[in-house]
Amino acid sequence: MKKIIELQNIKRNFQVGDETVHALRGISFTIYEGEFVTIMGTSGSGKSTLLNTLGCLDTPTSGEYLLDGVSVRTMSKPQRAVLRNRKIGFVFQNYNLLPKTTAVENVELPLMYNSFVSASERRKRAIESLIAVGLGDRLEHKSNQMSGGQMQRVATVSYTHLTLP
């Protein structure tokens, strides 16, 4: 099976005043294609730090992180942003929808960073995807006009198959 994510002795330290906080202490694991993984732990155990690392939002202090065989730790922020846009989808707890934009516009946003997708294709994909998840009647609604479940579907659509070239 193909390795999708591989972490080798990942450590992440933060400096808080005079104190060094060791958020991740030598995390190692591999996730193979087709596997589903759950990250669990008590408050303050490093779950968010680990997820931010896996999502290319943060870099480890030391260790090796390979995403689809590509070393992530030494990449620049712009390189990580491109990798994140092409390989990773997020559904945040608060959905991170832009409040003054419509469902279609929120779904289109991640594709704006994909130079292979034209504006008309981006809009077409967004509309088709929202219809597919039962939101055809909410295309032009803003987030404050949708239920929590509807917002979650908008967020899920925007960060899954739509980012593919």
Residue ranges and their predicted role:
Residues 2-164:
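ABC family nucleotide-binding domain
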